[in-house]
């Protein structure tokens, strides 16, 4: 073996951790894109690290059945008892119900609210994190993050030694506080902070300001004050500066980090999917056929139509950010298409965007159970689930403004599905990625797109 090969081997061995801890608000908690990022690469990580890979998430499903979490009384039983009795931590340990089934530690962080002011003071004194302007979800995320850091500290001191190489990866500003805590509490643990977007970049874009044209001119701290985002921006920025390694998910987001956080990423870690993420061959064909059948059946029962399998099915999806995700552009484009006299083919468009959802429509459920065909539409024939804010919803408001009411003569029909497609929504009852296979075209006209 030549010396260069030996050096390469030693460096690789030095940089390969023995244990990985990954913290995110979306572990066993499907909220947005980060859930997809973590869950679709967990299988590869699990294969490489086996049960030395630990995901840490918030225990927000207490008292309810969480289908994504398989609790185990045997996993880490001795440490769990120690964490409870000696470290005053409340955790549940189990497996994430995804390919690879990695170990998950869910943290009950409610007890830390009593120490909130002391925690924020500590973070200001050590890292200049400004929590004075906290509101909304900042406190909840911060207490979870701090608790997650405490959990990793407890696990490390109970199970590991200074010879074990451990890495803590914190995803998004919601887990920054825990990474900063570990920087001083357990400096032996290497800390990584990954931002999948920037809070200020998203807010600038969401407030109808030209982000990309004038990115070079924005000052992140100034914009945080203007947009009332001081605390979220502060934890994001200070974590990026103080952790051992700062990463982001794309070059375009790295540009945001340089300009708005005053810190370029040390590494750009682009997201990807497992090789088998998209089914192949007959499996793909079968799933696509079943998905189209479900979507067309729901549409026909809702609209009182008889749309056939030659219907062009298109869709968009994402978090409910009307401009950032291009929902406005999508609807306007459909409206123009609907007015095109040369359009001969039926078009069925789905807007799969979780809103303030109430219950699945009972009248639609009744029709779906029936084998009869219907030639009259239901009331409000463009939504599958009732909303709590039916009179103040941006999608419904724009459909009304555009005059898109799914008339029988319209070649373009639009259906708003305002819920998470987890297979148990009460109407479509299929997972999002299974339904996606049934679409002929997926459209994502985002204005703000960090590729995160």
Language-model-detected regions and their locations in the chain:
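Catalytic cores of nucleotide-sugar-dependent glycosyltransferases that transfer UDP/GDP/TDP-activated
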Residues: 4-452
